[in-house]
Amino acid sequence: MSLSSNHLSHRSIFACILFLFLTPLFCAAQTPATADASPTNSSQVKSVITQMRVRMRSVPLDVVVEALTGHKVLHFNPDNPNHAEVLKRLNLAAADVAAKIKAAGGITNKRVNEVGNIIEDYVRAAMTARGMTATVPTGEKTGKARVAGYPDVAFAFNGERFYLDCKTHDKSTLKSTQRTFYLSPSDDPKISCDAVHFILSFETSRNGDTYQLVRYKIVSLEKLSLDLKYEFNSDNRRLYSGKNGSEVLSDAACE
């Protein structure tokens, strides 16, 4: 199978999955719980859930993004002068971030996730200082800045727009197969245009609660291989209220 036909196959499969799985579940969830609707929708939902046992693996990021947002993940072309200059400036910005954090004595925080959030602020400031106007991406529908979710940074250079996600990693986890990249459907996607997508990831070293930056990687994500994991979830309100299908059997104080 050729690359183009394989790409088309991924696109077709993913579009079918979205249609077959997500649409019926959404419709069933929106239907009032009336006597005439319940049996049919129950069967429909069970059928869809059965199909969800089929796992989707190794779907390229560009296929997923276009299916979810309608926007393309563009190819990073090192022979494109604008792309080459962006990469050069990203390297300079990454070095600036490392130097500033080192001069500050590192980042001290008990929560490693917060370390990543702090680094994001350094990255946006350094990129902007290097001539790449970097901001928090805005939702395509609302136009409001959205911090949570992929990607972390939207930036522009010479009239071309780009996206970048900031990450941290430990040297010992580089070959880990645990999930570290997430992309979810949204009614207000942060991806609002065709663009090249990057990751800037800093390797960290830790001494107590203080983190230093050791090295960095810049990665182009166009063909990043993604797996799709289906997940059902709930929350404390539904778990412990005795409503929404749960039944509290005991609720007593400990002596």
Regions found by a protein language model. Give the residues of each.
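Interdomain/boundary linker segments immediately adjacent to catalytic/signaling cores
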Residues: 31-122
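Bacterial Sec-dependent signal peptides at the C-terminal "C-region" and cleavage site
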Residues: 25-31
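N-terminal secretory signal peptides that target proteins for export/translocation
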Residues: 1-10
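Catalytic cores of nucleic-acid endonucleases
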Residues: 166-211
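Conserved catalytic cores of phosphodiester-cleaving nucleases, focusing on short active-site segments
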Residues: 153-155, 162-170
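Domain-level recognition of nuclease-like catalytic cores that cleave nucleotide substrates
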Residues: 196-254
